[in-house]
């Protein structure tokens, strides 16, 4: 008995003393050549194991310790030569902000469960710069009808109504609210959208209601918000909360980015691998093969399910439509297609059916995409590509019909096809084949397409005219060279909410197109652009987001600037005066609501 007790005690002591693998990452200062020497220390890692982590795509040069190997996208790994502590020093770029540091460290051992590793960060002190704080004044004396988006015209008591003389006819979304001395509102509207917007306005007006007449309408028919759920998945309930925010800003289109390199986020019942494989994430096997799931996305999560069932999707559609919001889902093609390519390879392995093949096994193209993938482009010359997307289009059409909501368009992406794709074939001819193939699908089904500006450039005149006839809109960064197409303004420098608020290292986000805050979004001026502008849209890419708190932080308050520019296309007074009023409304009317709901937002 005593020996048994001692044995148990010894085993417990061994377990208690066993060290858990962990990591320390130390930021290095910038050197004269523009690089920085960073240090990564891995503690208590077993010999022969492999440590995976995620870091924004960037070349690295090791100067001490084992090599760091790039896999695909943001994934890197280190093979551990001996047990204990392993130190790596490597040259990379200087760290612009803390969120760019390596993250999601996972220990991989043969025959054992994967182990997430604790990471401790040691960042340099960075002096504050002028960009950390903008000029944000909120001393404008508000009147009762000052809300966001700002109303087109208002009359208090017996004051004359302004701007009505510029309204030649009542546009879609028009409404009028008349509030008498008793505070009882009467609403007139052009359509169901206008009736809903009137209700939103009434909910925002301070109580008790004062006598006034409001006449209001949107300057643009399209007012959108793009949500990327591919790189950092959002639950159904979180999407519904985002829709509520959109509705409160009188936005009317959710551009739902649900298929890209990193994940395929919608159930398609004919192809279970799209979600069984393409919406699950796991470390590659020891031979670096993705045998049962895709590699982790930038957030490093493994074992997670990142898709919407058909029932969940229709729930989102109905919820949005009840708030007068249309949903346009995007399946990014022909680049940004890695998730579907890998998933359909798994489908072919299971079924032996190659008739839906998305990538030619004989293709020897060598390319490097903007997000560091080498295998993410569709073989657009294969008829099987269009057979596959015909099935996808049919299912999306069916789901919208089942939900009883309109299908404005299907967004086909079309951006960032890397140079080197389709080696040995004429790139211009490949684009012609792709656009005409997608148009065949759309025309046969009586639906419209949408896409990023790349799809409209460099086409033959006949293809260009054909595209115009089946196109709802294209998202444009710049309207140059896009003559004759309906466009939705989506310039990165004004509408990409994932870009950091400032260069402060604590901010999350990228900065490749500069910094975007509520001053920048409010400054979007449609008069600076030519062409058939039907609206504006805010974009929220999610490669830097890790939580719903990150989502609302990047939306609030800068998303309001884009919403304002969708409803009111410009400002009729000096910018600082207009922005002072706008920001004063945010502080007085919007911030208390966010605080009451517990949303994370940018505080100043």
Locate the predicted segments by residue:
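Sec-dependent N-terminal signal peptides
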Residues: 4-14
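Flexible, acidic glycine-rich loops studded with aromatic residues
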Residues: 454, 461-472, 477-604
């Amino acid at each position: 008995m005593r020996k048994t007790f001692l044995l148990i005690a010894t085993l417990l002591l061994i377990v208690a003393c066993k060290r858990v693998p962990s990591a320390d990452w130390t930021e290095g200062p910038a050197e004269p050549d523009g690089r920085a020497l960073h240090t990564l220390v891995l503690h208590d890692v077993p010999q022969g194991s492999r440590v995976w982590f995620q870091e924004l795509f960037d070349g690295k040069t090791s100067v001490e310790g084992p090599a760091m190997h790039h896999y695909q996208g943001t994934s890197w790994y280190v093979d551990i030569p001996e047990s204990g502590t392993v130190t790596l020093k490597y040259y990379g770029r200087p760290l612009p902000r803390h969120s760019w540091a390596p993250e999601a460290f996972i220990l991989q051992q043969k025959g054992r469960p994967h182990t997430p590793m604790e990471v401790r960060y040691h960042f340099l002190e960075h002096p504050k710069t002028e960009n950390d704080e903008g000029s944000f004044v909120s001393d404008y004396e508000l009147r009762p009808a000052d809300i966001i988006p700002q109303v087109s015209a208002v009359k208090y008591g017996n004051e004359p109504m302004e701007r009505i003389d510029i309204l030649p006819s009542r546009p879609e979304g028009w409404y009028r609210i008349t509030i008498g001395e008793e505070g009882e509102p009467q609403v007139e509207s052009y359509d169901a959208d206008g009736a809903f917007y009137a209700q939103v306005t009434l909910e925002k007006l301070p109580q008790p209601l004062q006598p006034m007449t409001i006449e209001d309408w949107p300057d643009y028919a399209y007012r959108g918000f793009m949500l990327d759920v591919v790189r950092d998945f959002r639950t159904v309930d979180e999407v519904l909360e985002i829709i509520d925010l959109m509705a409160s800003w009188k936005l009317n289109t959710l551009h739902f980015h649900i298929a890209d390199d990193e994940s395929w986020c919608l159930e398609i019942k004919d192809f279970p691998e799209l979600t069984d494989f393409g919406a699950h994430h796991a470390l590659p096997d020891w031979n670096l093969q993705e045998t049962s799931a895709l590699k982790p996305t930038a957030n490093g999560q493994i074992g997670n399910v990142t898709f919407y069932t058909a029932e969940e999707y229709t729930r989102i559609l109905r919820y949005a439509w009840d708030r007068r919001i249309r949903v346009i889902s995007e399946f990014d093609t022909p680049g940004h297609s890695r998730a579907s390519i890998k998933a359909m390879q798994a489908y072919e392995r299971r079924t032996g059916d190659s008739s839906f093949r998305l990538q030619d096994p004989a293709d020897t193209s060598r390319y490097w995409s903007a997000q560091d993938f080498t295998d993410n482009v569709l073989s657009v010359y294969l008829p099987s590509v269009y057979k596959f997307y015909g099935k996808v289009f049919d299912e999306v059409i069916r789901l919208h019909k089942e939900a009883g909501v309109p299908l404005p368009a299907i967004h086909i992406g079309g951006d960032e096809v890397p140079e080197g794709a389709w080696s040995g074939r004429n790139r211009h001819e490949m684009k012609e084949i792709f656009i005409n193939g997608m148009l065949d699908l759309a025309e046969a089904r009586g639906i419209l397409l949408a896409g990023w500006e790349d799809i409209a450039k460099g086409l033959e005149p006949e293809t260009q005219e054909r595209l115009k006839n089946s196109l709802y809109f294209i998202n444009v960064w710049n309207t140059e060279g896009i003559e004759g197409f309906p466009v939705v303004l989506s310039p990165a420098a004004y509408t990409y909410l994932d870009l950091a608020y400032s260069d402060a290292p604590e901010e999350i986000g990228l900065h490749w197109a500069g910094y975007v805050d509520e001053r920048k979004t409010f400054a979007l001026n449609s008069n600076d652009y030519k062409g058939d502008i039907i609206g504006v849209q805010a974009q929220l890419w999610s490669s830097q987001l890790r939580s719903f708190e990150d989502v609302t932080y990047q939306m609030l308050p800068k998303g309001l600037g884009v919403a304002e520019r969708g409803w009111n296309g410009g400002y009729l007074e000096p910018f600082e005066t207009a922005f002072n009023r706008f920001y004063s409304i945010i502080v007085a009317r919007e911030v208390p609501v966010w605080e009451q709901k517990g949303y994370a937002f940018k505080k100043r």
